[in-house]
């Protein structure tokens, strides 16, 4: 087992999640939710910091095989879910860590289940993050990350095989990373198209964004 490449990959993933956490932080800044803003900035810093520390691990080989793919997939799912649940807990929106983890995993897996009886009273930054997890998971979390991760050789294929439910991986183009980029490019375009239609229908911008995040391609959760 090439543990070094697994942890290095996990480091990349956590740094990416740290960057993604800045988006709900920006929403909190716009709406003047200073406590929520601080929580997102702290969570982003911790995620990026841990990720950078793991990223410094130098593997002997940058190519990994199926067993490394399964290990990396499992660890990535655990860590991104735990870090994604932190803002719910620290802001007090979902005080119970288990409930917060359930809400986060439900978002990343687009399950659509929720422990929240109503979402209208949540801070806008939390609403943004909750809906954004659905959008990230809409095409598969690791498919999204595959489009960003700097892997080599057959590493992308082995990682996607570990994430995919079927016995084989279908590709639009020879490179798996290019396939992931094409798929998320189409996904992003469809999201923007839905957003435009919602705005034409006179839905407020913020609510339109949350609705587009949660309903592009599939229905996952109610928007406020």
Predicted segment positions?
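Conserved small/polar residues in nucleotide/adenosyl-binding loops
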Residues: 219-224
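Pore-domain transmembrane helices of cation channels
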Residues: 43, 47, 167-194
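Transmembrane-helix bundle segments that line or gate the permeation/cavity pathway
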Residues: 81-117, 124, 134-159, 186-188, ...
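Membrane-water interface regions at transmembrane-helix termini and the short interhelical loops
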Residues: 28, 53-66, 121-131, 148, ...
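Juxtamembrane inter-helical linkers in multi-pass membrane proteins
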Residues: 154-175, 212-217
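N-terminal alpha-helical transmembrane segments of multi-pass membrane transport
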Residues: 1-99
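Alpha-helical membrane-spanning segments of integral membrane proteins, especially the hydrophobic core
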Residues: 119-139, 170, 174-182
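Cytosolic juxtamembrane amphipathic/interface segments immediately preceding
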Residues: 1-4, 60-64, 164-178
């Amino acid at each position: 087992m090439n543990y070094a490449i697994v942890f290095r990959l996990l480091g990349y993933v956590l740094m990416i999640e740290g960057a993604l956490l800045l988006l709900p932080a920006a929403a909190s800044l716009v709406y003047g939710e200073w406590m929520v803003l601080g929580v997102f900035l702290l969570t982003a810093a911790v995620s990026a910091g841990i990720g950078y520390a793991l990223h410094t691990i130098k593997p002997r080989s940058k190519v990994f095989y199926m067993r490394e793919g399964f290990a990396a997939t499992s660890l990535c799912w655990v860590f991104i879910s735990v870090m994604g649940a932190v803002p719910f807990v620290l802001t007090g929106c979902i005080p119970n860590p288990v409930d917060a983890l359930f809400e986060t995993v439900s978002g990343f897996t687009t399950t659509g289940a929720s422990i929240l009886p109503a979402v209208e009273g949540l801070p806008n930054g939390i609403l943004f993050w909750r809906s954004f997890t659905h959008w990230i998971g809409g095409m598969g979390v690791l498919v999204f990350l595959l489009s960003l991760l700097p892997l080599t050789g057959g590493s992308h294929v082995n990682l996607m095989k570990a994430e995919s439910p079927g016995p084989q991986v279908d590709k639009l183009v020879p490179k798996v990373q290019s396939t992931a980029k094409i798929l998320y490019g189409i996904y992003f375009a469809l999201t923007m198209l839905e957003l435009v239609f919602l705005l034409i229908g006179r839905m407020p911008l913020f609510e339109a964004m949350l609705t587009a995040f949660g309903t592009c391609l599939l229905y996952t959760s109610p928007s406020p």
